[in-house]
């Protein structure tokens, strides 16, 4: 595989962030079709959209614990497989309650993605390259949201909304198979990493460890960081950003169809 395994892993993470948002936005884009087939109204869809975040929020924490215990490779692969399954099962939903349950399960399965990705970056990259890697993989999220409209819209119009979800399911499963074939928690556990790449990563990490020892950095508890104003302000800003983002991701496609007769 050459001497750039770590960047291949980043590419896979970039793709899974794209798939993550493609799967997440698919329901919003197909709402006008589903409303007619399942006789659902805006109030019910509001609860369905919101139910995703209850599962997602809880399993952000649980997913982080699982990543520390079982490793990022396993947790990420299983998470993608499960969320793809629950996304695909949307195709067989029969009404409000089945859609609600599937959306909660979908959110739970997506919860570990950020913890898994960050753990992989920490395992494969020294700090001097970590921000570049995170920036690249994070670009997958907005790009996934951008391509979701034309892709899901085309699939839904060409084959129907139920087959569209099955095709999206297949995309996630293909990614999962490739992930388990290529990824490992760290360079020293990868069967195909070159000695050149392994030595380079270890050398840079050793230099950083030596520098941290010289600086004698003090470790703090989680409570210490939760009391820092910069952390609280950043968290609030992120909350506001997500509120606006997911409002538009959830409802804007329906608005365009209902008010401007766009799309379906």
Where is each model-derived feature located?
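Extracytoplasmic
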Residues: 8-42, 248-253
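Residue-level signature of mid-helix packing/kink "hotspots" within the transmembrane helices
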Residues: 25, 53-61, 111, 145-146
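Extracytoplasmic gate region of multi-pass secondary transporters
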Residues: 27-28, 221-264
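Interfacial helix-cap and linker-helix signal at transmembrane-aqueous boundaries
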Residues: 34-35, 66-67, 151-159, 256-257
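Helix-breaking motifs and short loop linkers at transmembrane-helix boundaries and internal kinks
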Residues: 39, 71, 92-98, 109, ...
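Conserved MFS/SLC helix-loop-helix module at the cytosolic interface between two early adjacent transmembrane helices
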Residues: 58-97
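Cytoplasmic helix-loop-helix junction between adjacent transmembrane helices
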Residues: 102-142
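Helix-loop-helix hairpin linking two adjacent transmembrane segments in secondary transporters
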Residues: 137-190
């Amino acid at each position: 595989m050459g001497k750039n395994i770590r960047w291949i892993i980043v590419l896979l993470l970039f793709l899974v962030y794209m798939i993550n948002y493609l799967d997440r936005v698919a329901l919003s884009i197909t709402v006008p079709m589903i409303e007619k087939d399942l006789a659902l109204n805006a109030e019910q869809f509001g609860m369905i959209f919101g139910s995703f975040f209850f599962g997602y929020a809880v399993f952000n924490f649980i997913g982080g614990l699982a990543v520390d215990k079982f490793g990022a490779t396993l947790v990420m692969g299983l998470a993608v497989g499960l969320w793809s399954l629950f996304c695909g099962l949307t195709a067989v939903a029969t009404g409000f309650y089945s859609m609600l349950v599937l959306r909660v399960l979908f959110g739970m399965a997506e919860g570990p993605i950020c913890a898994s990705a960050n753990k992989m970056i920490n395992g494969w990259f020294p700090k001097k390259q970590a921000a570049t890697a995170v920036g690249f993989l994070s670009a997958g999220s907005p790009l996934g949201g951008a391509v979701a409209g034309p892709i899901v819209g085309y699939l839904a119009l060409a084959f129907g909304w139920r087959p569209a979800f099955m095709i999206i399911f297949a995309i996630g499963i293909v990614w999962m198979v490739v992930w388990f074939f290529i990824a490992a928690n760290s360079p020293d556990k990868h069967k195909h990493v070159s000695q050149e790449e392994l030595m380079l990563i270890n050398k840079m990490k050793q230099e950083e460890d030596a520098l941290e020892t010289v600086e004698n950095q003090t470790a703090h508890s989680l409570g210490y960081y939760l009391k820092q104003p910069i952390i609280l302000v950043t968290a609030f800003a992120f909350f506001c950003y997500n509120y606006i983002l997911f409002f538009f991701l959830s409802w804007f496609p329906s608005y365009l169809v209902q008010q401007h007769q766009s799309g379906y």
